[in-house]
């Protein structure tokens, strides 16, 4: 993380403490959303598969970005993650409207993360 602190960051980059707080809230909301889909009693296999796939993409983004410092590849990975989250949110919404809405903060945060990631990729 020392190398992250030394990066040229974008103007809207939040202080470091915001990230763990935001991710904690997001993971709670995502967990509730997936639980609502799971207990809905409606066909949910595809929605939960997409949910699982986007979680894997989320996990590996951190490795690409922080461990390997492959900022441009991480951005491309993040775009794919964003698309997966969008599809997941739509599928969740079709099964349980509240679960779809609970995914929106995650989608918005990853959109913001895309801005941060792209800036870092271009200016470092």
Give, region by region, the residue ranges found by the protein language model.
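Interfacial loop at the N-terminal end of multi-pass membrane proteins
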Residues: 1-21
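Membrane-interface loop-to-helix entry segments
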Residues: 14-28, 69-81
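Membrane-interfacial loop-to-transmembrane alpha-helix junctions, especially the N-terminal start
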Residues: 43-51
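Membrane-helix boundary connector in multi-pass membrane proteins
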Residues: 65-71, 87-100
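Core segments of transmembrane alpha-helices
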Residues: 23-34, 54-57
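Hydrophobic alpha-helical segments of small multi-pass membrane proteins
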Residues: 51-59, 75-88, 106-110
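Juxtamembrane boundary at the C-terminal end of a transmembrane helix
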Residues: 114-124
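Structural signal for the C-terminal ends of transmembrane alpha-helices
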Residues: 34-42, 89-94
